[in-house]
Design a protein with these regions (language model features):
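A short, N-terminal amphipathic alpha-helix
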Residues: 60-68
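Generic structural signal for well-ordered alpha-helices
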Residues: 62, 87-90, 113-116, 144-149, ...
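N-terminal pre-triad scaffold of radical SAM enzymes
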Residues: 12-40, 71-75, 222-230
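Residue-level signal for mature regions of secreted extracellular proteins and peptides
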Residues: 25, 29-32, 210-212, 256, ...
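Residues at the C-terminal ends
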Residues: 67, 94-95, 153, 181
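Core AdoMet radical
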Residues: 23, 43-53, 69-83, 94-111, ...
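Flexible mid-to-C-terminal extensions adjoining Fe-S/redox cofactors in radical SAM and related proteins
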Residues: 1-20, 42, 236-293
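Radical SAM enzyme [4Fe-4S]-AdoMet core and its adjacent flexible, acidic
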Residues: 129-251
Length: 293
């Protein structure tokens, strides 16, 4: 008799990722070591769910996903390494599922290397699997660079992304020069949101961020967005604002519906959903959602 698959053992439906999907966001926790003034998680009011599920619940649910080699699970937050079962989750996810990590690198590098093999977060990709967010108002750049070098020299796929906030643009660019000189991949991220009354960012639907009048529309995502309790959301706005989820990855019957959904809060979108950006192949012009009014 052959060995039963994970799906047969759990008697849960396989979660097929639609061909048009570009990203799988796994928000392990919203806890963070920092509180940056411009954090996109706090673009509007803080209403997102802070409860978390255990490592066993995460791995049981995530292992139902059937993805592609070019579409990993991206562990993020908050600071995902703060989840108490972080290493259990990383090492419990099926090996055929790729893993990327978004982090501020405020963890013990030696402990990380002891628990996570370099090959577990490495794949053929135009960007690093471990992506460090540099925030000038909170982080010591020299400490960050040294940690990145340690991981890089030990075979980890790692790079730094710096947010070009108007108040620290020059500082971020200076740190980038220092990192690049040491052989570190350093890239820039647009600042998204308002600063001194001005909206920053490049958006496909500029009137989706007026923050004045709510309008109706139909919206379809290209991302599987999983909140800290396993709930699945239409978009980042709904995740951060605590709106009703469209499903739960822990539900054995959950499947992704690649459809347009009605929305009544157009005008109050989250910048992450409507910004023009590169897709997972680093081709510019992608947007997380498609909106029809």
């Amino acid at each position: 008799m052959g060995t039963k698959s994970h799906f047969e053992e759990t008697k849960a439906a396989v979660i097929d990722i639609p061909p048009a999907y570009n990203y799988i966001a796994v928000f392990l926790t919203f806890a963070c070591n920092y509180r940056c003034s411009y954090c996109i998680n706090y673009f509007e009011e803080e209403k997102f769910q802070k409860k978390t599920i255990t490592g066993k619940e995460w791995t049981r649910a995530l292992n139902r996903i059937k993805s592609r080699p070019d579409l990993p699970l991206t562990l993020q937050g908050g600071e995902p390494t703060l989840h108490k079962d972080f290493y259990e989750i990383v090492n419990g996810i099926r090996r055929d599922l790729g893993i990327d990590l978004l982090t501020n690198l405020q963890f013990d590098v030696n402990e990380f290397m002891k628990n996570v093999s370099p090959d577990r977060m490495k794949r053929k990709s135009p960007y690093a699997s471990i992506r460090v967010s540099y925030h000038a108002e909170q982080m010591d750049p020299d400490e960050m660079i040294e940690k990145v070098l340690v991981l890089q020299k030990n075979g980890y796929s790692i790079g730094i992304w710096g947010v070009l906030h108007p108040a620290s643009d020059g500082q971020v660019r200076d740190v980038a020069k220092k990192a690049l000189a040491k052989g570190i991949d350093f890239r820039f991220k647009e600042f998204l949101g308002f600063y001194k009354g001005k909206l920053y960012g490049t958006y496909r639907y500029p009137d989706s961020l007026t923050m004045k009048n709510a309008d109706r529309c139909m919206c379809k995502t290209t991302e599987l967005i999983i909140g800290t309790e396993g709930s699945v959301y239409r978009c980042h706005h709904d995740l951060y604002q605590g709106f009703e989820p469209v499903g739960d990855i822990k539900d054995a019957a959950f499947r992704i519906e690649d459809i347009f959904r009605p929305c009544a809060v157009y005008g109050f979108c989250n910048p992450c959903d409507v910004k023009l950006k590169t897709n997972r192949f680093q081709k510019f012009g992608h947007t997380s959602v498609e909106i029809v009014k």
